Structure formats: structure tokens, C-alpha cells
């Protein structure tokens, strides 16, 4: 079970969340986000995989950020095409494509990205690009028959543990935590994250 904590920015908070047990850590390179990372922090995680989050960004700029931040994966939240995903994957980056889910038909577009992404991320549909703080109906995902593993996102918070323990899917690979564990934009409650990760990993391997 991959535990990704997204929307990180502040050096000491990065260090604390790394020590709390996160597997992956996300950095948002979308200027309109309240969690936008405008420059390289003084500390970047050494034990976590670094994930760069982009929205409708050019491949050239993505590759530059990947080099600057030592990114392992890129997470694409916009209208990126399967061809762009394929080229970025060929450049040596892990690719995570995000799909906004409100109904079963929203899963159909994922089929075009099979084979060119390492993971999908299913998030709650909203007017913006993620960060809604709301949970969608996870039962919709039982209709997903793809071969690409996925991360579950959208409104996860400390009280979500029981729901996660009930959820089952053979392609479910991990979860994405963000605003539900924040004390302010880009600042995570490391104690809450640590407790949640420990409780989850005791129950799910």
C-alpha cells in the first residue's frame, strides 16, 4: 500500500512527514494552487519518492522540474494526451494520470492511457484541478477493469480509515493524502499523518 502525501512545500514539514512514514511525497507546480512550490525547498525527502504535480504543462518544463527536484514520478492533472504521457515515460519518468470521477462513465477515458502510465489516480470531480476536500462514491471504481494500478484520492482524512478498510479492488495500489491532514495550505499535521499511516499499515499490507 503506497501512502502518498501531496501538497508539500515547507522544509521542516517535509522532514516531519518523511519521518511519519510517507512513501511518496507530492510537490505541486501549478501556480494557481495554494500549495504551489515556486522554488526548491532547503530540504527535499531522501527516503520518499518525489512526485511532481503538473496541470497542462509543456513536456520541456516538466523535464526541467524533474531534473531540478530529482522527481521519480510526475502526476498529470490536466488535459495531457496519451502521447505526451508516453514520451515522458520514455524519458525515464514514472507517470501518474489523474481522472476526476463523479459517475461510472468517467472511467472510460482511462482506457486510452493504458500502457503509457505507471499509475492512475482517481479523484473527486470538481470545478478545479483536485483539492476539493470531498470524497466521491468509491463503489463506482468496481466498474474499473483496467490493468493499470491506481491510487485513491479525494477528501481522505483521519476519519476515513474505516472506509478504506472496507474498500477492495485488485488494482488498488495506494492512497493520496492532502487537505484532510492540513493545519494550513501546504502544512500537514505530522502527528495525525503518523498515526493514520501506522493504523492503516497494521491493517493493510
Curated annotation (Swiss-Prot):
It is an enzyme of class 5 (isomerase). SUPFAM superfamilies: Ribulose-phoshate binding barrel. Pfam families: PRAI. It catalyses: N-(5-phospho-beta-D-ribosyl)anthranilate = 1-(2-carboxyphenylamino)-1-deoxy-D-ribulose 5-phosphate. GO terms for molecular function: phosphoribosylanthranilate isomerase activity. It comes from the Bacteria. Its EC number is 5.3.1.24. Pathway: Amino-acid biosynthesis; L-tryptophan biosynthesis; L-tryptophan from chorismate: step 3/5. Keywords: Amino-acid biosynthesis, Aromatic amino acid biosynthesis, Isomerase, Tryptophan biosynthesis. The keyword Amino-acid biosynthesis applies. It comes from Phocaeicola vulgatus (strain ATCC 8482 / DSM 1447 / JCM 5826 / CCUG 4940 / NBRC 14291 / NCTC 11154). This is N-(5'-phosphoribosyl)anthranilate isomerase. GO terms for biological process: L-tryptophan biosynthetic process. HAMAP family: PRAI. Belongs to the TrpF family. InterPro entries: Aldolase_TIM (IPR013785), PRAI_dom (IPR001240), RibuloseP-bd_barrel (IPR011060), TrpF_fam (IPR044643). The keyword Isomerase applies.
Amino acid at each position: 500500500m503506497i501512502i502518498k502525501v501531496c501538497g508539500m512545500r515547507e522544509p521542516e514539514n517535509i522532514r516531519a512527514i518523511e519521518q511519519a512514514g510517507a512513501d511518496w511525497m507530492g510537490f505541486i507546480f501549478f501556480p494557481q494552487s495554494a500549495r504551489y512550490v515556486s522554488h526548491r525547498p532547503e530540504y527535499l525527502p531522501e527516503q520518499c519518492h518525489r512526485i511532481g504535480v503538473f496541470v497542462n504543462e509543456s513536456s520541456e518544463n516538466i523535464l526541467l522540474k524533474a531534473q531540478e527536484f530529482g522527481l521519480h514520478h510526475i502526476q498529470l492533472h490536466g488535459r495531457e494526451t496519451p502521447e505526451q504521457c508516453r514520451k515522458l515515460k520514455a524519458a525515464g519518468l514514472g507517470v501518474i494520470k489523474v481522472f476526476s470521477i463523479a459517475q461510472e462513465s468517467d472511467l472510460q477515458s482511462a482506457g486510452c492511457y493504458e500502457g503509457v502510465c505507471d499509475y492512475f489516480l482517481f479523484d473527486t470531480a470538481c470545478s478545479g484541478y483536485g483539492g476539493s476536500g470531498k470524497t466521491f462514491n468509491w463503489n463506482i471504481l468496481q466498474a474499473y477493469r483496467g490493468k493499470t494500478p491506481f491510487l485513491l484520492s479525494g477528501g481522505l482524512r483521519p476519519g476515513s480509515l474505516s472506509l478504506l478498510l472496507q474498500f477492495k479492488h485488485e488494482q488498488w495500489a495506494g492512497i493520496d493524502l492532502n487537505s484532510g491532514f492540513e493545519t494550513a495550505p501546504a502544512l500537514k499535521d505530522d502527528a495525525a499523518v503518523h498515526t493514520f499511516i501506522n493504523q492503516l499499515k497494521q491493517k493493510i499490507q
